[in-house]
Amino acid sequence: MVSLRDNIESQPLSHNRRVRKNFGHINLVADIPNLIEIQKNSYERNFLQLNIKDSERKNKGLQSILNSIFPISDSSNIANLEFVKYEFDTPKYDVDECSQRSLSYAAPLKVTLRLSIWDIDEDTGTREIKGIKEQEVYMGDIPLMTKNGTFIINGTERVVVSQMHRSPGVFFYHDEGKVHSSGKLLYSARVIPYRGSWLDFEFDAKDVIYFRIDRKRKLYATTLLRAIGMNTEEIMKFYYNSVTYKCIKNKGWSVKFIPQHITAHRLTSDLVDADTGNVLLKAGQKITPRLAQKYFSIGLNNILVTHETLIGKYLSEDLRDPESDEILAKIGEMITADMLQVINDLKIKNVNVLVINPQSGPYIRNTLFADKNQDRETALCDIFRVLRPGEPANIEAAESLFYNLFFDAERYDLSEVGRIKMNSRLELNISEEITVLTIDDIKNIVRILVELKDGKGIIDDIDHLGNRRVRSVGELIENQFRIGLVRIEKSVIERMSAGDVDTVMPHDLVNSKILVSVVKEFFSTSQLSQFMDQTNPLSEITHKRRLSALGPGGLSRDRAGFEVRDVHPTHYGRICPIETPEGQNIGLINSMATYARINKHGFIESPYRRVKDGYVTDEVVYLSAIEEGKYKIGQANSKVDQDGKLQGEFINCRVEGGNFVMVEPYEVDFIDVTPMQVVSVAASLIPFLENDDANRALMGSNMQRQAVPLIKTEAPFVGTGVEGVVAKDSGASVLALHDGIVERVDSNRIVIRTLEQKVDGSPSVDIYNLLKFQKSNHNTCINQKPLVKVGHYVKKNDIIADGPSTDNGEIALGRNVLVAFLPWNGYNFEDSILISERIVKEDVFTSIHIEEFEVIARDTRLGPEEITRDIPNVSEEALRHLDEVGIIYVGAEVKAGDILVGKVTPKSESPITPEEKLLRAIFGEKAFDVKDSSLHVPSGVSGTVVEVRIFSRRGVEKDQRAIAIEKQQIEKLAKDRDDELEIIEHFVFSWLEKLLVGHVIISGPKQITAGQTITTEMLKGLSKGQLWQLIVEDANVMNEIEQIKIHYDEKKHALDKRFATKVEKLQSGDDLPQGALKVVKVFIATKHKLQPGDKMAGRHGNKGVISRIVPEEDMPFLEDGTVVDIVLNPLGLPSRMNIGQILETHLGWASINLAKKISTLVKEYKDNNIDIEQIKKFLLELYGKDINYILEGSEEGIISFCNKVSKGVYFATPVFDGAKVQDVKDMLKLADQDLSGQVKLIDGRTGEYFDRLVTVGHKYLLKLHHLVDNKIHSRSIGPYSLVTQQPLGGKSHFGGQRFGEMECWALQAYGAAYTLQEMLTVKSDDVNGRIKTYDSIVRGENNFESGIPESFNVMIKEFRSLCLNVKLEVTASK
């Protein structure tokens, strides 16, 4: 067999990646996990379990729901519907087809169900199987996830955002003294299930414990304890210890000495040892727990107390008469002086009392005695009355309701997470499979609540990430599925009971529409299913990694307090403390940290390196917030020697509660993997983040997501090293699926012959069709450009084509421009930005925006609408861009008002006279009246038509334009097929040639004689078909040729079949909405150059609006004549405290000057003035050992590398581990620049130097999608409001500028009476006045008469609505 990897001499593409000088000191041992893994894992792996055999599927996601809902039985148990397995069919359309046709990308779900019919003997009740029917039932189309972690719903890309919610389990907290006026802490506990009723326990101000179910009326907690089967004695024994007082004649009572029950106080009586009679402490002396422990350790076991000590104690069992066994006092009753007298009189020797003291309060006992319910039945009925007021309470109904509330798995579910949390908090060991409440749970919740009241233990922190978990896509959709399947269950039971079960098949019972509508509703309307932010690749990634506390089952932004929104110590390495929206959602919508991942229970985990005996290992362990609390964790920048031993006497470590302690190296358990793990992806792209104020960093990370993809992309000179990861994981770039050799490349596609050998040894072919000028969700342009050349060898996952906002496989949101910090004629007042004309001229910040316009031809009551060029009352000039069908040509330049698609609609006719009817009957039908309803370019839009799509209903004949577009698409498919076949044929026939050469022919084509030995020249003279006719003597060779032929034919057949299927899809009509005959979509691309009013920003939260574009000759320039591109205000820095931008500017200045130095060295080398060693030495000084592989290569390779950095040297300064001020100075020194980073600038207008040195450097700036073209418009005449008759407001309504109250004051202050009158009348709501004014303008006169404004009439009507009749009386002036 031929090896596909023979003769690969080309350099692998991975060496073509951009090299950055990295300032990071910390050695990375863990790679950044795939940034969209959270979406894909949750949906595909955990919910759908795609591509997993039925037998190997775990009981989770879809499998677990189907298992829990089925089997379904009818009421009489005759029919039983069981679930066997499920599988997905292939989706009808692929992702691209769904986007173009406005369809949802989904796969049909087929569930195999088994219907068993039983025969029940009426006399004996025995059941026998009567029949079994198994059938595959269609359950609807289930949306599939694209490879980029998104869903396509009705043609638009959507993202399902993960939700943060409170974890199921039990939580204890108090009211912080806010409820009671005294400031007393009222403790409470809440059991939150995943599904089911909430259970609350709470103390009131009198220290009685209550409980509530679903926030209904409260009841005594002991009512619930009785309802779960506990009696008074069991309650007392569970919650209290008991101590026995023994009577010692004439001395008092002896009781066991327990030092734990002693608190510091002064004794009211002597402390006497009951066994020896010794007085240990006199009355009035102080005893402390420490002293008590000392006495206990030297043998004090029992102490003597007086008779009066028993008064006020509570009995721990019933007090009985020793002779008659009569109950004198019940358990829990207080011992009074009278009762003590009875005890003495009856000579009762032992009295058992409850241990109630300051460490163990009488709360349960008091609640028990306040509660009127004495048995389980009355307690259950009491609960029933609260939950079902008005219904008669009987014990059966009450018992059933109580059981269903908390103990029925169908109605109550704590979930596995809830059970784990419950076990951990209550110190229980109940199986994780039991996800309902147990009696032990309820008993222990009350126990812990009482202990908290007694001052033992601490309350839970609800903002701790151990108590908040993430519900990702899979889980959110799983919940919707459950709702749908529960509805299906009800309908199945109804259908089973209604019809004749014997003749029914499983598909007759299941109505899939119920499930489809629930899933569709979730994807279309849920708050968590969002229109994807597709401004640029970073905004896509951030959207997929977003965590929202809002949404169903979450918080509401109006009621969320400061604590929920605040940064919590457990966010470290899990949730970014920087990236969150400004405004009312601050802190409620967060972003996952770069290295964070979500575990199977939904808790966020962060990676740490394990430390053993003071040595840092390379073992990476992911810990959740709960686990992290058990360890001491050092920082990533802790000093470590070459062997990994932690340096220093003490190491700064984080411990539980977010506190920092200094510990010895051997006590450290883990250290951080990298300082970058703290922040999110967007924040990790900000160089010198550590030098910026957090508020500005927040703005910086948010504004990067608003950067518009530019025509010319350029990666930042000063980056952080994460740019490549973001570009790769975003899906904007094209990655190679397999190792291979590039066979063909053009701007539209890349063809790669893979090196993955198939079973038959033939290569497969990967064809990558690139996206060209496609519209994104936010009207930005998606365009992919190839990076590879023919003959390149590419490795799997190498980037072979750049997408929007990427440059050589790195994210590139803006451009590097030369910036000076300098005030310039007030044009950079208040953060305004002054730009050079060069930026506009050379399209530095020019972007393409694509808008989509759609027209639908419908079948109306009066007849069908028609797309045509024949439009009434339209000049030929207006139709110049339309083809013969009436649709605009691709490439046409259009402006506002131009016709894009000509369309006419039938008009209703006026009634016709009998004479006209007769004439029509004789001379034939006259053409119907039609009106023009063409699609025009809206105001404010102009550009080039880049694409036209035509969709026709099935059965409707296609027009010429649709046929031409279809033909073009078929040719494209045929080219893909032919290229793939050609590569396979080349391989197959070269293999065939190798097999045949040197063998003796037995028979063959006519021109070949038997007995000849085959040579290469002989084979060249034969056609491909004739090669298969050759038969040689060697039987083994013939067998191998036979196999090759079979595989070749199969492959060719498969390619033809795939081509035919795609063509059939193209040629069959489209599924259009009801009544639509044809849909035409026109895409217009507009080039937006930078202009005054556009918003720009840096990466450090420094934003501003362009105030003026200055000619190059007027801009400040350097001594070498280089003109500054942008002038910024130096006053924008000190108060904002984002010093990172200055460091970036300095390093950018070093970058550009180092590049100049390298270019000079290369020029000198080419002129033979220096040898390559000097270049090597300089590169080694600059980059260090990172580029040894280049320096050890060929001279051409070194010069090629130097040419790549001729515009600027690329730096990486990782977040919190980047370049320090000294590093920046070192680079400036290496570039032969002043260490201040400042230079002399010359004023372009005067030619004179500025008075002071100016900070100049290359800085990375972004153009944001707040473009002035989309904000400012002008109105001459336009629509008016119906009621007030005033012009509308806003661009979308083509409205005017509001002249409000304060503006009127301004005119009054200037005494501009006529202008004011004009503003308030004819330019606003004086209807008659404005008509007269218009007439006078048309006639060329300049006088106008103002009347009564409509707002006056509105005011009069307002008075009338208040029953005040106001009349306007006009009196003639004298």
Curated annotation (Swiss-Prot):
GO terms for biological process: DNA-templated transcription. InterPro entries: DNA-dir_RNA_pol_bsu_ext_1_sf, DNA-dir_RNA_pol_bsu_external_1, DNA-dir_RNA_pol_su2, DNA-dir_RNAP_su2_dom, DNA-dir_RNAP_su2_hyb_sf, RNA_pol_bsu_bac, RNA_pol_bsu_CS, RNA_pol_bsu_protrusion. It catalyses: RNA(n) + a ribonucleoside 5'-triphosphate = RNA(n+1) + diphosphate. The keyword Transcription applies. Pfam families: RNA_pol_Rpb2_1, RNA_pol_Rpb2_2, RNA_pol_Rpb2_3, RNA_pol_Rpb2_45, RNA_pol_Rpb2_6, RNA_pol_Rpb2_7. It comes from the Bacteria. It is an enzyme of class 2 (transferase). Gene3D superfamilies: 2.40.50.100, 2.40.50.150, 3.90.1100.10, DNA-directed RNA polymerase, beta subunit, external 1 domain, DNA-directed RNA polymerase, subunit 2, domain 6, RNA polymerase alpha subunit dimerisation domain, RNA polymerase Rpb2, domain 2. Keywords: DNA-directed RNA polymerase, Nucleotidyltransferase, Transcription, Transferase. DNA-dependent RNA polymerase catalyzes the transcription of DNA into RNA using the four ribonucleoside triphosphates as substrates. This is DNA-directed RNA polymerase subunit beta. It comes from Rickettsia typhi (strain ATCC VR-144 / Wilmington).
